[in-house]
Curated annotation (Swiss-Prot):
Gene Ontology, cellular component aspect: nucleus
SMART domains according to UniProt: SANT
Organism classification: Eukaryota, Viridiplantae, Streptophyta, Embryophyta, Tracheophyta
Keyword Manganese: no
Gene: MYB106
Annotated region of DNA binding: 37-61, 89-112
Designated name of the protein: Transcription factor MYB106
Disruption phenotype: Overbranched trichomes.
UniProt-recorded Gene Ontology molecular function terms: DNA binding
């Protein structure tokens, strides 16, 4: 624990200093120096505590203390330092030579503070009272304005970011769709570039003479020829198919029974094109097998078979031979065509 304060000792005098006490203190310090302030009162013969002797010497009895009235420059310095430092009188006193902190404090409270109040200046903030009142309301208005501007700015930035994201997504989607279309069109283009002359052409609908164009033949099949054979024409097909690309191709299917009918069957265009374009050789044999087949016996449509049911085996055999010779003559024309063979390769 610390020492007890010297002022608490019994028999010590308090209150204002008398001239006799000031004289004793001055005489002792001039002769011996102040030394220890705690033991100085007993040596100097004073009924005072050491703290009281120190303050009396520092604030009043020092020979370098400047007495008298404060100048205008000193007043301005005190006001400026008080605005910066506040009530730190010891720090203010260091900037005023030969002026004590106690004297500066007393002069502030008795003169300078009252003068500022009369001028309409707050002695604490050193600002006009009207400005202090308006500053509180002005700060609130400025804060509200800044908050409103910040909200608009944040909303604008969010909108710009959202538009940028949507534009990027649309660009990526368009790019992916183009890639998918290019990938799907690549196999067809590769297959068709091998033999471009074998592409089928869609016959004109609505004409009386419709042509069935072969990839390797220039033979024209009229509608009058196809009807007795039981081959359906384009007029009997679906007329609602408006697709620009060929949606179906024709394939001949032959049944093995004696009353089999020769008919055309729609097959997917890719299977037929792959068979024609990507096949290696044997185009004439393939066309022959589709039209004639492996069996020698070919029947006419059902109506023709019923009409010739009473004919004998010999007449029936002669009719089949004539039919076979008829198709062989057509195939010979196909094989001997120089223009088609030139366009194929």
């Amino acid at each position: 624990m610390g020492r007890s304060p010297c002022c608490d000792k019994a028999g010590l005098k308090k209150g204002p200093w008398t001239p006799e006490e000031d004289q004793k203190l001055l005489a002792y310090i001039e002769e011996h120096g102040h030394g220890s302030w705690r033991s100085l009162p007993e040596k100097a013969g004073l009924q005072r505590c050491g703290k009281s002797c120190r303050l009396r010497w520092t604030n009043y009895l020092r020979p370098d203390i400047k007495r008298g009235k404060f100048t205008v420059q000193e007043e301005q310095t005190i006001i400026q330092l008080h605005a910066l430092l506040g009530n730190r009188w010891s720090a203010i006193a260091t900037h005023l030579p030969k002026r004590t902190d106690n004297e500066i404090k007393n002069y502030w409270n008795t003169h300078l503070k009252k003068r500022l109040i009369k001028m309409g200046i707050d002695p604490v903030t050193h600002k006009h009272k009207n400005e202090t009142l308006s500053s509180s309301t002005g700060q609130s208005k400025n804060a509200a304005t800044l908050s409103h501007m910040a909200q608009w700015e944040s909303a604008r930035l969010e909108a710009e970011a959202r538009l940028a994201r949507e534009s990027k997504l649309l660009h990526l989607q368009h790019y992916q769709n183009n890639n998918n279309l290019n990938k799907s069109a690549a196999p067809q283009q590769h297959c068709f570039t091998q033999k471009t002359s074998t592409n089928w052409t869609k016959p004109n609908q609505g004409n009386g003479d419709q042509q069935l164009e072969s990839p390797t033949s220039t033979v024209t099949f009229s509608e009058n020829l196809l009807m007795p054979l039981g081959i359906p024409t384009d007029s009997s097909r679906n007329r609602n198919n408006n697709n620009n690309e060929s949606s179906a191709m024709i394939e001949l299917a032959v049944s093995s029974s004696t009353s089999s009918d020769v008919s055309l069957v729609k097959e997917h265009e890719h299977d037929w094109i792959r068979q024609i374009n990507c096949g290696s050789g044997g185009i004439g044999e393939g066309f022959t097998s589709l039209l004639i087949g492996d069996s020698v016996g070919r029947g006419l449509p059902t109506g023709k078979n019923e009409a010739t049911a009473g004919v004998g085996n010999e007449s029936e055999y002669n009719y089949y031979e004539d039919n076979k010779n008829y198709w062989n003559s057509i195939l010979n024309l196909v094989d001997s065509s120089p223009s088609d063979s030139a366009t194929m390769f």
